Amino acid sequence: MTPHNEAKKGDIAKVVLMPGDPLRAKFIAETFLEDAVCFNTVRGMLGYTGLYNGKRVSVMGSGMGMPSMGIYSYELYHCYDVEAIIRIGTAGGIADGVELRDLVLAMGACTDSNFAHQYRLPGTFAPTASFELLEKAVQTAREKNLRYRVGNVVTSDIFYGDCENETAEWKKMGVLAVEMETAALYMTAARAGKQALSITTVSDLPLKGESTSSEERQKTFTQMMEVALTVASEAVDGYDK
């Protein structure tokens, strides 16, 4: 147990899906998992473990932003022996050709945060996905004939920014989308020697003023969920050996 998670050792699977919204975790458990059991309700950050395609998988909310993702992912890696975390969430598409409901598989994560300062590195760290998980996700998206993009995202500490041009500047660097958690997950995984992947669905196009509804974000972005669950169920075998 930790201050934020009432689960006991063994309650959580080796691979965990992490949506930002704990209600999305509940939806995934009730919709996709067999024999799902709730292992955490502390602070309303719901977590469940069940079976997907006969493989043991967990899903737990991360909350919004890098500090929250940093706390929950750190505890999962260090206190519960989790080997891989797959973030599933929403992002604002900013690159040309990225459309609403497209999947974005984050190969790397830029950030405006000083999250990496804690590591006292003598230079700049480039947070990246675990290639094995990314490769599985790309293969799954292709097999399902889904619209997806692979590339950089930018993880921002700021949702309501004071500078209107920042998103456009990231676009110039080929960044696909903006969100708020991936860089923290990738850095936490790297420091722990574990694996991580971020799969997001484009819920907004901030440079065009287009968006989806909050209800749709919670309950209908099932393509992302199914890709992540497939990757998780296939990855479990490698960690259970």
Language model: regions and residue ranges:
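Metabolite-binding pocket within alpha/beta catalytic cores that recognizes anionic/polar moieties
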Residues: 1-127, 131-135
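Active-site rim beta-loop-alpha module in soluble metabolic enzymes
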Residues: 124-173
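His/Asp/Glu-rich mid-to-C-terminal helical/loop segments that flank catalytic regions of hydrolases
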Residues: 206-241
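Generic non-transmembrane alpha-helical segments
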Residues: 136-144, 188, 227-238
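Flexible, glycine/charged-enriched surface loops at secondary-structure junctions
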Residues: 34-41, 145-151, 236-241
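Glycine-rich beta-alpha junction loops
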Residues: 22, 92, 109, 154-158, ...
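A C-terminal functional module that forms or caps the active site or interfaces directly
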Residues: 164-205
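Generic structural signal for well-ordered, non-membrane alpha-helical segments
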Residues: 18, 25, 65-69, 126, ...
